[in-house]
């Protein structure tokens, strides 16, 4: 009798772990935003900042992400942008918000002659307003739309 129960339970456990396990390693849109765009430790004047950060934040795996922006403020400051000026996103959606003030950012752009796996980025330190798309409950940034 015990063997019959274990033969029934084993396939059920396999099914449950098959459903649960993939979701455990999947990051949310908000977590992805934080990984790709937040660096509150402050900007670096190093010309290799973008090369280091793009690699460290897994944006050079399989291909070189062409453009990325890092914001050098605490996450709470960037989350607060979601309650600031509502603007239209580049894709036409209406869930974008523009910061009231310019923020310290680093703009990373793939150099023209750079090819995977040797991703080489131009690092530019700037002070600009940011535009982010926000979603969810709590309402948080999920996409970096632009800097202006």
From Swiss-Prot:
Q: Which residues are glycosylated?
A: 58, 86
> Which Gene Ontology terms cover its molecular function?
lyase activity; nucleic acid binding; ribonuclease A activity
Q: List the disulfide bonds.
A: 50-108, 64-119, 82-134, 89-96
Q: Main location per UniProt?
A: secreted
Give the subcellular location.
Secreted
Where expressed (tissue)? Answer: Pancreas.
Q: What is this protein called?
A: Ribonuclease pancreatic
Organism, scientific name: Myodes glareolus (Bank vole)
